[in-house]
A protein has these predicted regions:
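Conserved donor-binding/catalytic core segment of Leloir-type glycosyltransferases
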Residues: 39, 218-240, 261-262
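Short acidic/histidine- and often glycine-rich active-site loop of Leloir-type glycosyltransferases
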Residues: 186, 343-353, 357-359
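Nucleotide-activated donor-binding/catalytic signature segment of Leloir-type glycosyltransferases, i.e.
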Residues: 265-307
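Aromatic "clamp/platform" in nucleotide-sugar-dependent glycosyltransferases that forms part
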Residues: 320
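Short glycine/serine-rich donor-binding loops of glycosyltransferases
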Residues: 325-328, 346
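Short hydrophobic beta-strand element within catalytic cores of glycosyltransferases
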Residues: 328, 337-340, 350
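Conserved acidic donor-binding segment of nucleotide-sugar-dependent glycosyltransferases
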Residues: 352-363, 371-376
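A short, well-ordered alpha-helix in the C-terminal region of glycosyltransferases
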Residues: 378-393, 399, 405
Length: 424
């Protein structure tokens, strides 16, 4: 395994954004935990929301007095091919696992478990998502409490793949899910804890950026900043439905011929299908000069994503399945009018008609885009409400508070406030 260097962050820098009550609660929770040790394990250090969260969460935990560390597991392409199949199946894909794929999954998990020689030196070990989920089965130690943090939608999983994973999940003292509907019934979990993820308002991706600066950055990529822009920021993945976004854009363009579309994504090494779907999306664009596709490999990093979101007339997350979709909160925090698919965690972030719009089809997405463009006054009111909603519920200090509360619970202190669902 490889340790990830996360740098330094200070909780005090967030106080003006979160208010006194939450800041004081965090301090009170952190004080008796000083010196406790928490290790996080995940599949990748870049590309995707899990890694983004870790780059802020881990240094904030350290600032709060926790001895926290983040490591990335090792794996080859055959392993990530299998874990992508598992990921898709847990979100409803009908394809199951062969005996060979099951052996590959367990084999790489054992390989990583064997490299975890210091497991008994940690108070809590957190495993993120399915890729490393079997590691506790292969670690011979009784000291750490094991926690599985699930970042995907498990509301309608492939039953065969869930049956394969469930015995491995029963090795955990607690499993954390974004929403109650994601807790898999019949899996026999010891305990399920519910909390949503969060964004870092001070990270380069979300820091305040003047409109002129955003326009300058976007202009460098060949986008005409004098014309309106529809934007989706997401991985290139069928669950994110970039083809549906293109369909919506084409409908809008019939009314607003100057409309442009940018699809911006990050290509992660644990997502072998990403390039295949990139190519499929590119073909679907049909060489339209007003459709742009960018990734981290086009030098689109955190600041550039920020600029595209600030510049966009409408931000879209038209997922058809979605673990949570933090790009929604990112756009809402920037006071951008936002449209999301009526699925998963997007519904927790958008109150339809109040803080944004929820849609079920490309046609609805196009209609709501036209509504936004037609009524700037109502749109401004909606975006103000949306920013305040994100401030209350989806900023990183609230997530830190939840992790500190869980550490108390793992130490046997059950009086801390957490949403807990009994395992079944």
């Amino acid at each position: 395994m490889q340790r990830v260097n996360v740098g330094h962050k200070a909780l005090a820098d967030y106080n003006s954004l979160i208010g006194r009550a939450l800041a004081e609660e965090i301090r009170a929770l952190a004080e008796p935990l000083k010196g406790r040790r928490m290790l996080h394990l995940s599949a990748t250090a870049f590309g995707g929301g899990v890694a983004e969260i870790q780059y802020t969460l881990i240094p904030l935990m350290i600032d709060a007095g926790i001895d926290a560390e983040w490591r990335v597991i090792q794996g080859q392409e055959e392993f990530y091919d299998v874990t992508k199949t598992i990921h898709n199946a847990l979100q409803g894909d009908e394809r199951g696992l062969t005996d060979g794929q099951r052996a590959i999954f367990d084999g790489y998990n054992k390989l990583n478990a064997d490299s975890l020689a210091d497991a008994d030196e940690w108070d809590v070990i957190v495993v993120h998502d399915p890729q490393p989920a079997a590691i506790p089965e292969f670690v011979q130690t009784t000291r750490p409490r094991w926690v599985w943090r699930c970042h995907i939608d498990l509301s309608t999983p492939n039953p065969d793949v869930l049956d394969f994973l469930a015995p491995r999940l029963r090795a955990y003292d607690a499993c954390i899910f974004h929403m109650p509907t994601y807790v898999p019934h019949g899996a026999g979990l010891n305990e399920a804890v519910i909390w949503p993820p969060a964004i870092d308002p001070l990270a380069p991706k979300n820091m305040a950026l003047a409109p002129d600066d955003a326009a300058y950055i976007v202009d460098q990529f060949g986008v005409d900043v004098s014309r309106p822009l529809m934007l989706q920021v997401s991985r290139f993945d069928p669950w994110k439905d970039p083809l549906g976004v293109i369909d919506a854009y084409r409908e809008v363009k019939r009314v607003h011929p100057g409309m442009q579309l940018a699809l911006v994504g990050s290509m992660a090494h644990d997502d072998p299908e990403g390039w295949e779907y990139w190519n499929r999306t590119q073909d679907y664009c049909n060489e339209d000069p007003d459709i742009f596709m960018f990734s981290n490999l086009n030098n689109v990093g955190a600041v550039e994503v920020n600029a595209f979101q600030v510049q966009a007339a409408v931000c879209i997350q038209k997922s058809i399945r979605e673990g949570f979709g933090l790009t929604v909160s990112e756009a809402l925090w920037k006071s951008r009018p936002t449209i999301g698919g009526r699925v998963g965690g997007i519904v927790a972030q958008i109150s339809d008609g109040e803080t944004g719009y929820l849609v079920n089809s490309p046609e609805e997405c196009a209609k709501r885009t036209l509504d936004i463009l037609a009524d700037p006054g109502a749109t401004r009111d909606m975006t103000r409400r949306a920013k305040e909603h994100v401030r209350r519920k989806f900023l990183m200090p609230r997530l830190l508070r939840d992790w500190l509360a869980l550490m108390h619970r793992m130490a046997g202190e059950t009086t801390v406030e957490l949403e807990v669902v009994a395992g079944d």
